Amino acid sequence: METFNHIDIKKYTREDLLYLRNTNNVLFKMFQKQVDEIACLSSKEQKLCGTLTSINNIINENYTIYCLIHTDGLIGFIKIGEKNLYLYDKIKLHYGKCTCVLDFYILEKFQKRGLGIKIFNFMLKDNDISAFCLCYDNPSYKLQNFLKKYFSPCVLIKQPNHFVIFSNYFKNVSIKKVYERISN
């Protein structure tokens, strides 16, 4: 098994990307191209027609992207952001602003080397949040297995909106973030 030294994790917010675009457009375009390439692979893995991630999407929607960077360039990312979602807990319908994992992909050559959990834990720590408090946008089979492997025991609950939550999501999310509404 090949070891990969010199792997960094970098966080880019909307403000970071706007600053990069305004101060070093050449570097911005190169980064944009790398994100687009990995986003295409992520979409292909999920059997989607279009891509979920682009620099413009991150800027326009005020999302955050965490990037795994190797000496050769970008090798993977996690995109997170807040979304207003309706979620069911089998009894009640909840509505609120939820922190979501919107896209997660690592180049195949770099998978199964502990880099996924490394970037995932970095993102969790940076946001002071638990994996059980996140919503996952239409996670691929690989992402579901990743969650089961590292956050076991877990039961993932599919929502009608294609998001997935952990079965104990409502026990972990503060009432300030999710408001209850009686479902009819």
UniProtKB/Swiss-Prot annotation:
Keyword Thylakoid: no
Protein EC: 2.3.1.108
Reaction(s) catalysed by this chain's protein: L-lysyl-[alpha-tubulin] + acetyl-CoA = N(6)-acetyl-L-lysyl-[alpha-tubulin] + CoA + H(+)
Domain of life: Eukaryota
Domain N-acetyltransferase: 1-170
Residues involved in acetyl-CoA binding: 104-117, 140-149
UniProt keywords, alphabetically: Acyltransferase, Transferase
Record GO biological process: regulation of microtubule cytoskeleton organization
InterPro entries in UniProt: Acyl_CoA_acyltransferase, Atat, GNAT_ATAT
Site label Crucial for catalytic activity, positions: Q46
Pfam families xref list: Acetyltransf_16 (PF05301)
Root EC class: transferase
A cellular component term, taken from the record's GO annotations: microtubule
GO MF, one annotated term: tubulin N-acetyltransferase activity
Known function: Specifically acetylates 'Lys-40' in alpha-tubulin on the lumenal side of microtubules. Promotes microtubule destabilization and accelerates microtubule dynamics; this activity may be independent of acetylation activity. Acetylates alpha-tubulin with a slow enzymatic rate, due to a catalytic site that is not optimized for acetyl transfer. Enters the microtubule through each end and diffuses quickly throughout the lumen of microtubules.
PANTHER family linked to this entry: ALPHA-TUBULIN N-ACETYLTRANSFERASE 1
Entry similarity comment: Belongs to the acetyltransferase ATAT1 family.
Name of the molecule in the record: Alpha-tubulin N-acetyltransferase
